[in-house]
Amino acid sequence: MLNSEFLEFPETTARVATLDNGLEVIVKEDHSAPVVSLQAWCRAGSIHEGGWLGAGMSHFLEHMLFKGTERRNANEIAQAVQAEGGYINAYTSFDRTVYWIDTPSAGFENCLDVLCDVVAFARLPEDEFASEADVIRREIAMGDDNPEQVLSKALFRTAYTIHPCRYPVIGFLDLFNQLGRDDLYGYYLEKYSPDNLFVVVAGDVDADETIERIESHLGGISRRRRPSVVLPEEPRHIGIREESVPFSTELVRGRLGWPIPPGDHPDGPALDILAAILGNGKSSRLYREVRENQQLVNSVGAYSYAPTFQGQFVLSYDTEPGSSKSADEAILGEIDKVKSDGVALDEVNKVVRQALSSQFSTLTDMRGQASDLGSNWITTRNLNYTRDYVKDLQRVELEDVVRVADQYLADDRFTRVSLVPEA
């Protein structure tokens, strides 16, 4: 153990109940404030779209679920939540779609009714389909003008050769334009079967009553047949893959990415520590050496992206056009220094303290608690996963950080993508 001040978060008091139709309910009572966060998680994201890969179907469906149910139109959905002082929103990623409402506890019952209605009884009205499709087309166009989004898409399509995360969550315009309302509704019926959903509630509620209420709303929905989606395993990365994208920019924006294991792998904590030592903040090695000392970049950072599938260890930077080669070499040189010279105890302990503080902050509000439980469940089916992660983070030894740098950050096996000024 590196740090004698070993801290441990107590196990969650959240409960899990499974209804007869397979829908799972997770409830965490917290009466510290009269607030509730309720979330519906669907195990369907852009990587699960099968024959429609690249069309952005999951994201489009997220938009359309707010457009009307059997009992409410779009305005009535929004007004019902606002009347309780609540806020409703949603997001879609590679492997999930999440709908959430934050509300004062006095409005919990009505907001729960709205959330269940939206997720389980959506109509996807034809008269809303065309207008919402136009909204998403504008989103796609905005993304094509956003350098960070363009660079991220370039990284994923280059780093992955067969895994469906190489397609953007929002989809490609030409494939998106082929979607019809019936295609979307068929996908909805398939993916939003109760056994592919779970509901998380955290806050000022009674757990038994909450489970009963959710069962009254959703327990009568029958499971629907869902074809299994087998995700291809990304083959071993061989060599250096490169892509350079001309873009309307004065700077060169670069990213270097190395394949790393999924988020539940035992090496995850050591990789997170390595990323923070290299590129998290002004005290990081890359900032001090490559930006301040050598003045080769305008900005630089690092992060470890470890989802439910093979992830990426990413180093990013912005630099002047004439400095990109030198910046690349200097950044790779800092990795070599970790491999040859190791890391310091105070560097590791600083990262651990920051992670503990971040986790504590996450658990101080209801949405943070609900999101933590939901993410843990969809990733590992262990509600205490992040608590276990914090324990593991504090057990990382100096040699573990060097080992993962040696094992995963090979100098002849990574992806390099960049945005360069248009000629």
Which residues fall in each region the model found?
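Active/ligand-binding-proximal structured segments within catalytic/core domains
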Residues: 22, 30-81, 256, 266-278, ...
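N- or domain-start disorder-to-order transition segments that initiate the globular core
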Residues: 1-35
